[in-house]
């Protein structure tokens, strides 16, 4: 991928459980931290904001972009990508974003797809497909 961003993290990494063989034993302090649930759960949500990429050349990438927030309330925000030339297998998708900008993007897409857009707010996607 030229860019891959996702808020759909793996919950197994966020909600750890102490293995049975360690119960009742002294464990490192950072394990205690990892085993402590985040309450309320909203405090544990990741936020991706204010991301800038420019002057990128990519050849034979699998996909140009996969960028997605979690839902209507938890979006990726303020992404600015410019001056990108790429040859890719497929275009990809942008979903649940706010203020996502693509400018001066030149794509050669093997499967002839275009970047799909889903539930984005105030986004400006300017792509020259070759």
What are the residue ranges of the model-derived segments?
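Extracellular/periplasmic carbohydrate-active domains that bind, remodel
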Residues: 1-130
């Amino acid at each position: 991928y030229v860019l891959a961003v996702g808020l759909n993290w793996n919950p197994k990494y966020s909600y750890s459980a102490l293995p049975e063989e360690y119960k009742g034993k002294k464990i490192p302090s950072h394990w205690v931290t990892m085993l402590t649930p985040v309450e309320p759960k909203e405090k544990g949500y990741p936020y991706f904001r204010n991301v800038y990429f420019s002057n990128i050349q990519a050849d034979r990438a699998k996909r140009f972009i996969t960028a997605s927030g979690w839902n209507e309330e938890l979006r990726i925000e303020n992404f600015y990508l410019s001056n990108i030339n790429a040859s890719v297998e497929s275009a990809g998708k942008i979903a649940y974003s706010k203020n996502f900008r693509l400018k001066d993007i030149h794509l050669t897409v093997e499967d002839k797809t275009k970047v799909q857009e889903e539930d984005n707010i105030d986004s400006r996607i300017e792509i020259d497909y070759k």
